[in-house]
Amino acid sequence: MSNARATHLTRRGILAAGGALGLGAVLAACGDDDAKSGGSNEAAGAGKSGPWTFEDDRGTKVKLDKVPTKIVAFVGVAAALYDYGIAVKGVFGPTKTKDGKADVQAGDMDVSKLTVFGNVWDQFSVEKYAAFAPEVLISTTFDSAGTLWYVPEASKDKIAKLAPSVAVSVYDRQLTQPLERVWALAESLGADLKSGKAAQAKKEFEAAAERLRKAAKARPEIKVMAGSASQDIFYVSGTNLSIDLEYFKALGVNFVEPPESAKKEGGGWYESLSWENVDKYPADIIMMDDRTQTIQPADISEGTWKKLPAVKAGQVVPRSPEPILSYAKCTPLLTNLAEAIEKAKKVA
């Protein structure tokens, strides 16, 4: 997934419009080291004992003699498990910002207490990972090959030899599916999810989904565009591969949808526009990528952006292309969009 391997697609581009953009097209050559799968964590609810088995979304079944406690996970997965009482100690992926604060993808975790094996793309300390003696590695996957997200292509084989891996697919499915998978993973690791905080969070998610459904039905004329900003390119996401957009669309949200021919260069994930052409698609609401590697709306200086009707109307809301897959963290994604649609003025 290096810049060289991505040819004309930049790394920023690959990350821009849905987490993995053209992993199908861009990373097909990467393949995947079909590493064994497994996932788990040590936790506040760690009363489980005995053998541990988990079948991941690659169809790979991981079997360990005991429930793992030395878990290493992609930071977003670790943050979701944390919400269920499973305290992952080792992470990789965007964990800390340049000033040392928690990245948006770290959720509620105390990042000062985490062992970080790599904080940016293509960075993963194999030596540090080996010394940690992991029992399992858990990540998401953005393609049909099961490529482990944020596990570098150059070192994936070495990493795979040190511990089995578990992959949670976030490719071409609705948000509810990976939510259910992480729930099952947490439960297998000893989390008590049948009552209390977790059960309540699930109910609140379901209520938020119903609110969004009603808002979309009441305001079918409101057009929503999902965007992501880089210095030279504005990415317009399609809805057919991203877990959040697929789900919102299923709930009835009226999205801007670039034609497949326009999304081809982006592996089917997005269309790239120059800032001069950022007004190509009329939109009443713009959802903007909230990840730290993208330019945030307040920092966009392009005049063409500032002239957009949705921007002038203050109808720009955040979007999390790589949502933390716990019900508690995904509920606000639904309520924020529902509220935006309910209050939106028809400006496009």
Regions found by a protein language model. Name each.
Residues 208-220, 229-236, 267-291:
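Ligand-binding pocket segment of bilobal, Venus flytrap-like solute-binding proteins
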Residues 74-128, 132, 141-148:
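A short, structured surface patch at a secondary-structure boundary
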